Amino acid sequence: MGDSRDLCPHLDSIGEVTKEDLLLKSKSTCQSCGVSGPNLWACLQVSCSYVGCGESFADHSTLHAQAKKHNLTVNLTTFRVWCYACEKEVFLEPRLAAHPPGPAPKFSEQDSPPPSHPLKAVPIAVADEGESESEDDDLKPRGLTGMKNLGNSCYMNAALQALSNCPPLTQFFLECGGLVRTDKKPALCKSYQKLVSEVWHRKRPSYVVPTSLSHGIKLVNPMFRGYAQQDTQEFLRCLMDQLHEELKEPVVATAAALTEARDSDSSDTDEKREGDRSPSEDEFLSCDSSSDRGEGDGQGRSGGGSQAEAELLMADEAGRAISEKERMKDRKFSWGQQRTNSEQVDEDADVDTAMAALEQQPPETQPPSPRSTSPCRTPEPDNEAHMRSSRPCSPVHHHEGHAKLASSPHRASPVRMGPAYVLKKAQVPGSRRRKEQSYRSVISDIFDGSVLSLVQCLTCDRVSTTVETFQDLSLPIPGKEDLAKLHSAIYQNVPAKPGACGDSYVAQGWLAFIVEYIRRFVVSCTPSWFWGPVVTLEDCLAAFFAADELKGDNMYSCERCKKLRNGVKYCKVLRLPEILCIHLKRFRHEVMYSFKISSHVSFPLEGLDLRPFLAKECTSQITTYDLLSVICHHGTAGSGHYIAYCQNVINGQWYEFDDQYVTEVHETVVQNAEAYVLFYRKSSEEAVRERQQVVSLAAMREPSLLRFYVSREWLNKFNTFAEPGPITNHTFLCSHGGIPPNKYHYIDDLVVILPQNVWEHLYSRFGGGPAVNHLYVCSICQVEIEALAKRRRVEIDTFIKLNKAFQAEESPSVIYCISMQWFREWEAFVKGKDNEPPGPIDNSRIAQVKGSGHIQLKPGADYGQISEETWVYLNNLYGGGPEIAIRQSVAQLPDPESLHGEQKIEAETRAL
């Protein structure tokens, strides 16, 4: 794709350049000060062979360019070219290919025939996170942009700043913007993408006004309308759920076979699960942070460039060795959960058997586990497979009951769960529901983890296991007594019962509340050592994952014993997320009052280790996390102010984001903060070395006969994830191995071309695939799409014709009822809004059975009226039932003349 980057007028001043010359110069030293590489710069002016150091030393390369008026220089480590006059990167690929003496570049047209499809040239870009770590014209790092307060919107600003400083998510919206496509309103992903682009723009303003995103979130959830203070954690959940809904894509079934074919250590990180919400803050038993996100399980593109981008945009995370100012030249240009069911695994089996059954399923084909609001924390664990309602397209309903709390920071709303149905799956009335489809999005790829919840009967030792997906962990803050129990349990290696931890601040009357308030004031004026050990984040995690006894009013209903039994309940992490979101439960809301737990919780800036909390079946190799950002709340439960502390990924410094004001702070300020929400990122030196190795392979520029297309989205994961998982090219391929027709017109936004040596290295390291050397539209999908379009057209035309006849009928002999819930699904399908046809007609929601066994319409039911012909037509297509008629055939009315005669006779009789 040609663009202005190819039009540098100074290219004519370049002499002959060959790969051998550049490699030879890369081993030399600065001709002014004698310093050796890496990151020397070579002048490209005709007849000039000067090699100078960069800004990590004395920057003689820049001094030479200014003194000699030589505009073009090339970095001898990354082989990227900078023009001082144009102040931008330029690309030499077309020019290099034109010089016969030099070796043909590895991606020249001689190496492989031009594609047979009308694709624009696909850029060769292996972009590293560091590539986006470029700086301003004034040498200030990017991302230091404030956000204007729109009226008590600090909760939103703090949350957005914290998310903005999560590199995997930000890089997706910056580098993979072409994947941000949705037809769902209010297109919040577009608003968020625009906001991120403004915040991280090279010419960033001092602050931005997030009006569009604020308006969109208010459309999604009415709770955020008005100007009342809200809870930043509720905002985060709502925002990420909506982003997931808008960006989710179905998981291609054949992708599972790819993970089986490769023996990759990191394959589990690519496991596709639908997104889920975090749990209620009301109860603390043992696993209270699983949540219900609904039908999306969890994993986008950057605008393409021209073939000239074959210049290899791979930035080095080794760039840590390059000075940050050096990156201005080197990278300045580069920024241009559904699921409805909690997966209860083999309830009647022992845990080993259950886990064996789970492991037999490839990660990408396992049934989506819901973000159910913590079945493991319900007072009485239900042994049935819990059926949760799928996440609505708009999370509005999750908050309706809590608008009254809008004036104060909210707890993690218990209404985040869907209603738990009392029917087992086998009891769902005769309708076969649509086959459940697994979904993933960038949100679920980054934030989704899973926990294994186990409940053991202490009488028969039966163990029930449930796999749940979480988006964040809501941790209780242990009190002094709970802390002593936890430490005692840790040192004695015995299970602790943390149940009281979550309730320690709950069962308080007014008097207890006043006493507690006075105590807190005294504590705040007294040195912390006087009160004993400080609560740590590890203590909160230990309290969360500790075993919980089920006895008394909270006994376990054992399926095997068929009785209420004493039991024990605990959970372990089965899969770690790439970014771990931790929510500390500081707010308690009672009927008459609310209050805030202001206890300081110390947290590590680096090296948070979750190994003690992992299940033995956990396949995540990287278990340590480094802090990215922390959201703090200053004030009380009724009022206050949110700010965020974030580490800038460019220079590693910490900054305070207080609405439109951004201030650099020392890390000790962060450590002493009253944390409310924390974002941790997996840390791995091995991942950094892996990126450096790929940079080196790409810099070799070996000629290759084959070019390999790789998913731009997966490449972004490779550049920003510690465990990217197997290569997943099914983000741009269909199940038949071709390009889906609906993606063909923007395929250059979905793929990146890699040289053969880079592909072979990535494939041998991560597995996955499949290998793609040729892009073509899938003819099978095209036929299926045409057949589907024809089916839709026939169904909707037939319905319209039958309905018109029904409307024209003055006195229909019979009227049939149809569930509007099913009808809306069918309507979305025939109008092209949903690719999946509805399941069988399900009138069970609008039907009730009388004592005689007669089925009739339920009062207040959500139904529509259709003719008998329409019912027969739809029932023949989809099946289902039951059949409900609200008006049966009526007896024939008497003839008006005979009626008049009868009236006359009756009148005469009365007269006599």
Curated annotation (Swiss-Prot):
Pfam families documented for this protein: DUSP, UCH, zf-UBP
BP GO terms, sorted: antiviral innate immune response; endocytosis; negative regulation of canonical NF-kappaB signal transduction; nervous system development; positive regulation of autophagy; protein deubiquitination; protein K48-linked deubiquitination; protein K63-linked deubiquitination
DUSP domain segment(s): 685-778, 787-890
Top-level lineage group: Eukaryota
Catalysis performed (reactions): Thiol-dependent hydrolysis of ester, thioester, amide, peptide and isopeptide bonds formed by the C-terminal Gly of ubiquitin (a 76-residue protein attached to proteins as an intracellular targeting signal)
Subcellular location: Cytoplasm; Endoplasmic reticulum; Cytoplasm, Perinuclear region; Cytoplasm, Cytoskeleton, Microtubule organizing center, Centrosome
Modification(s) after translation: Ubiquitinated via a VHL-dependent pathway for proteasomal degradation.
Region (Disordered): 101-120, 258-308, 322-415
Modified residues (Phosphothreonine): 259, 378
Zinc finger (UBP-type): 6-111
Active-site residue list: 154 (nucleophile), 641 (proton acceptor)
This enzyme's EC code(s): 3.4.19.12
Biased composition range(s): Basic and acidic residues: 260-280, 322-333
Coiled-coil ranges (or none): none
Residues that, per the record, bind Zn(2+) 2: 30, 33, 53, 60
Annotated Gene Ontology cellular component terms: centrosome; endoplasmic reticulum; perinuclear region of cytoplasm
Residues bearing the modification Phosphoserine: 112, 132, 134, 306, 369, 408, 413
Record keyword Cell cycle present: no
Function: Deubiquitinating enzyme that plays a role in many cellular processes including autophagy, cellular antiviral response or membrane protein biogenesis. Attenuates TLR4-mediated NF-kappa-B signaling by cooperating with beta-arrestin-2/ARRB2 and inhibiting TRAF6 autoubiquitination. Promotes cellular antiviral responses by deconjugating 'Lys-33' and 'Lys-48'-linked ubiquitination of STING1 leading to its stabilization. Plays an essential role in autophagy induction by regulating the ULK1 stability through deubiquitination of ULK1.
Family: Belongs to the peptidase C19 family. USP20/USP33 subfamily.
Domain notes: The UBP-type zinc finger binds 3 zinc ions. However, it does not bind ubiquitin, probably because the conserved Arg in position 55 is replaced by a Glu residue.
Quaternary structure and interacting proteins, as annotated: Interacts with VHL, leading to its ubiquitination and subsequent degradation. Interacts with CCP110. Interacts with DIO2. Interacts with HIF1A. Interacts with ADRB2. Interacts with USP18.
Annotated protein name in UniProt: Ubiquitin carboxyl-terminal hydrolase 20
Organism name: Bos taurus
